[in-house]
Amino acid sequence: MRRFVTLLIALLCLSATAVQAQVEIRAPGQQTIAVANTQLVPLSGTPLPAIAAELHDVMAADLELSGLFRQLDPAAFLDDARRPGLTSSRVDFNQWALLGAEILIKGGYQLQGERLLVDFRLYDVVHRRLLTGRRYAGLRRDVRTMAHKFADQVLKSVTGREGPFSSRIAYIDNRTGHKELYLMDTDGANALRLTDHRSIVLNPDFSPNGREVIYTSYRRGNPDLYRKQLSTGQEARLAFKKGLNIAARFRPDGREIALTQSATGNPELMLLGTDGSRRRRLTSHWGIDVDPSWSPAGDRLAFVSDRQGNPHIFVMDLLGGQTARLTANGKYNATPAWSPDGKRIAFTRLEKGVFDIYTVRPDGTDERRLTFGPGNKEHPRWSPDSRFLVYSSDQDGRKGIYIMRADGTGIRRISAGGGQCQHPAWSGQR
């Protein structure tokens, strides 16, 4: 497994409230924040244009995806952008202000053998001061992770919420001829195959701490539930009752797993311990109950049931036992995903032979359609900060993994290669 970058030093982190007093926070689609994203300069030794360009380009792509920033043309940048020195006293704030910059990203790097040291700084141009800084140390191969991590900090500095760019996405890819589990960065880089079951693997989900992934595999002929430790690669079979053991989801506190099993003859929602031991049966109904998704507090479950004829989204209160139908429209609603901030539930709906993605409040109000156009858009999952959704789509003719903002804008395909990709899951922060 790819080694995580070590964060050595956190420098002068200002509070979110201080930053909000300097830069008005705008939602995607509203007036954006003007950012000068400069290429990092060598702290010592020979300039390495490839490293500088990669750090800059990864950061630029992350900031563009957020929808919060307007990036100034680097061709207009000053000599100040190429000067060494990262203290506020070395920044020509007057000249950056004349260019229209509201915030400024500068930094430096140093490569010694395979060891890479990167310093980032984020400045408030309007008030002429440092907002935040980070120093990262790792290997040359960690350069993209370092840029993602600082992009997370840029979002935190201007919104109060850390970005999701250094998290990861699990998904299913059949590039080998079999549906196997893969892992990639949020921009599609560093794709890594996690299983070699030579069978069908489906429905991955990350543990809340991001250290494990659970998934269903037909490796032994039955759809059994497996768990894999990402740091060691160790795999264990958790649930293997005859029939279905599918669509498993970790409870937000990481102590239990909800899934669908059909050992009783009818697909029902069950609650298991993380060791696979059965805790209790959650549903007992003639209809099919599948695709559970936890509320952030872990006290409610959204799920799909055809108990009223057609597949619809329902919400179950685990404390009181009451169940209420969430979706009022459409004849086929599926794959609910509760946002980490608790404000919205994403799901797919089949209309006129095509699946599209919608969101709705947990009380069933304010339904919004997010996707349009040709092709199916399925299996939505939220980013850990609730700003984005990842999903699978065949809109380009071949199933791939896509990311979009929570309002449906900024659609970007992130998967590559010749396989058909589906069933994405988004990890928490790392």
From Swiss-Prot:
Highest taxon above the source species: Bacteria
N-terminal signal peptide: 1-21
Residues annotated as transmembrane: none
PANTHER family: PROTEIN TOLB, PROTEIN TOLB HOMOLOG
Function in brief: Part of the Tol-Pal system, which plays a role in outer membrane invagination during cell division and is important for maintaining outer membrane integrity.
Cellular location(s): Periplasm
Stored InterPro entries: 6-blade_b-propeller_TolB-like, PD40, Tol-Pal_TolB, TolB_N
Source species of the chain: Syntrophotalea carbinolica (strain DSM 2380 / NBRC 103641 / GraBd1)
Name of the featured protein: Tol-Pal system protein TolB
Assembly description: The Tol-Pal system is composed of five core proteins: the inner membrane proteins TolA, TolQ and TolR, the periplasmic protein TolB and the outer membrane protein Pal. They form a network linking the inner and outer membranes and the peptidoglycan layer.
GO cellular component: periplasmic space
GO biological process: cell division; protein import
Keywords: Cell cycle, Cell division, Periplasm, Signal
A Pfam family the protein falls into: TolB_N
Family membership noted in the UniProt record: Belongs to the TolB family.
